C-alpha cells in the first residue's frame, strides 16, 4: 500500500517541485515516468501550473490502483492468494480500449476526464490481481525464513558427545 501511495506522490511531486523552483529534482521525477508514459502536456492534468509526471490516463490507472490497494481488504480477505477470473480484468480494460480507439479514430473526442476515469477503473481492478501475488510472495518469503530458522535451531540443539562430535 505504501508503495502505491508513494508512486502517486512522486507523480504529484514533479509539478510541485518544478513550480517551486526545484528544477533538478523535478527533472528526476519527470524522467522516472518518461519511460512509462508519453507525458504529452495537452493530455495531462496540471498542478500549480505544471503538467503531472504522467498523462491523464496513466494518472487514472495509478490513482485507481492505489485506491484498489487501499480498498482491497474491504473487498477480499488478505489471506486469499487466488486471483479473480481474467475476464474481469479484460472487462475492466474494455472502457479504456474503447475510449482510446474512438479518440484515435476521431469518432469520439475523449477528454482528460474520460481518460482518467476509464484508467481508474482498470487500475482499481488490476489491484485485485497484483495484491494476491504480493501476498503469496510475502508468504513464500516467510515460509523460507521459518524453514531456515528451524534448520539453524535444529543444528544447534543437537547434543555433543564427549569427543566433541555431534551425536
Over which residues does each language-model region extend?
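Membrane interface segments of multi-pass transport proteins and intramembrane proteases
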Residues: 76-83, 107, 145
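Short, highly charged, low-complexity non-transmembrane loops/tails of multi-pass membrane proteins
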Residues: 139-167
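Extracytosolic (periplasmic/ER-lumenal) interhelical loops and adjacent juxtamembrane/interface segments
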Residues: 16-54
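Membrane-interface loop-to-helix entry segments
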Residues: 51-67, 113-124
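Small-polar-interrupted transmembrane alpha-helices in polytopic inner-membrane proteins
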Residues: 3-11, 68, 83-107
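N-terminal signal-anchor transmembrane alpha helix
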Residues: 1-24
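Membrane-interface helix caps and helix-loop-helix hairpins in membrane proteins
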Residues: 51, 78, 104-114
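Membrane-interfacial alpha-helical segments at the cytosolic side of multi-pass membrane proteins
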Residues: 60-78, 125-135
Amino acid at each position: 500500500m505504501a508503495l502505491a501511495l508513494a508512486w502517486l506522490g512522486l507523480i504529484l511531486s514533479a509539478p510541485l517541485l518544478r513550480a517551486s523552483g526545484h528544477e533538478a529534482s523535478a527533472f528526476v521525477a519527470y524522467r522516472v515516468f518518461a519511460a512509462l508514459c508519453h507525458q504529452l502536456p495537452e493530455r495531462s492534468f496540471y498542478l500549480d501550473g505544471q503538467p503531472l509526471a504522467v498523462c491523464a490516463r496513466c494518472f487514472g490507472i495509478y490513482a485507481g490502483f492505489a485506491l484498489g490497494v487501499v480498498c482491497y481488504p474491504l473487498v477480499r480477505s488478505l489471506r486469499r492468494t487466488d486471483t479473480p477470473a481474467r475476464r474481469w480484468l479484460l472487462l475492466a480494460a474494455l472502457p479504456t480500449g474503447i475510449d482510446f480507439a474512438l479518440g484515435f479514430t476521431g469518432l469520439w473526442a475523449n477528454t482528460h476526464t474520460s481518460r482518467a476515469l476509464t484508467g481508474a477503473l482498470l487500475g482499481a481492478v488490476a489491484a485485485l490481481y497484483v495484491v494476491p501475488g504480493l501476498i503469496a510472495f510475502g508468504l513464500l518469503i516467510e515460509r523460507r525464513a521459518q524453514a531456515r530458522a528451524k534448520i539453524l535451531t535444529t543444528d544447534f540443539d543437537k547434543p555433543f558427545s564427549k569427543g566433541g562430535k555431534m551425536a
